[in-house]
Amino acid sequence: MKLPGLNAARTGLNEAAARAAGYDVETVVAVNDDKAHYYPGADNFITKLVVDKNTKKLLGVQVLGPGAVDKMVDIGVTAISLGATLDQLENMDLAYAPPFSTAIHPFVVAVNILLNKMNGDLESMTPAEYMENRGEGYRVLDAAQAPSIPNAKFVDVAKVHGPLEDVDKDEKLMIICTKSKRAYMLQQRLKYFGYTDTTVVEGGLWFNELPVKGK
C-alpha cells in the first residue's frame, strides 16, 4: 500500500490473528535504517515481526516506511513459505550496496532484535504495552544522543562506567531513546553494573507518542 510519504506492506498473520489461531506468540517492533544512513534519501523501516514462541517459526511481518517495504515483506513471504525459524534467518547475507540497504540487512537486524528479546538479553515492552500504561511506576531514563524527554533523567551511554548517581539498583527503570538501539546498549551496561529491573520501550521516540512523564 502506498500512502503520501509512507509505504506499508504485510504478510502472514498479525498478532491478533496469530493469537486467535492458538499460537503462543512473541513479537517485536524494530526501527532501523532502510539503507546506509549517510546515503542521500536514507530513512527508516518500522518492522513488526510475529513468531510462534515455541518453535521460533515466523508467522507474520508488517513494515512501514518511505522506502522499499515490498523487499522486506518478500523476505518474510519466503521465510513463512519455507517454515523458517528465527535461528535460520539470523545470519542471512542479503544483497548490500549503500543506496539500497545496510551491511546487515534491516530484516536480519529485526530478526536479531527479536532473538535477543526471546533469549532474555533484551527486556522490553511493546508499544501496545506502553500505551496500556505498563510503564506506570517506572522511572524514565532518556538514552537519546541529546536530552529529548521532558522531566526524564538523561544518561549518555558512552559515559556509563559504573553505577548511576541517584539511581538505585533495584529501581524500576524504563529506558527510551530515538530508535531503541542506545536504550538497549544502556540496558546492557546497567545490567552489568547490577541493575535488576530495566525495560526498553520498543520503537523508541520514533514510534511512541510524547510527552513521556519522567520521575
Regions found by a protein language model. Give the residues of each.
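Short polybasic/polar patches that bind polyanions
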Residues: R19, I80, K191
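A short, polar/charged loop-to-alpha-helix boundary motif
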Residues: P66-T85
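Generic beta-strand/beta-sheet core signal
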Residues: V28-A30, A143, I176
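Generic secondary-structure signature for well-ordered alpha-helical cores
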Residues: L6, Y23, S81-T85, L94
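Generic non-transmembrane alpha-helix signal with a bias for helix starts/N-cap capping motifs
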Residues: T11-G12, M72, A183
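Mid-to-C-terminal Rossmann-like scaffold of FAD/NAD(P)H-dependent oxidoreductases
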Residues: M1-G67, T102, P106-E132, Y138
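Rhodanese-like catalytic fold shared by cysteine-dependent sulfurtransferases
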Residues: D87-P98, T102-S124, R134-Y138, Q145-M174, ...
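Generic hydrophobic alpha-helical segments
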Residues: E15, G76-I80, Y130, L173
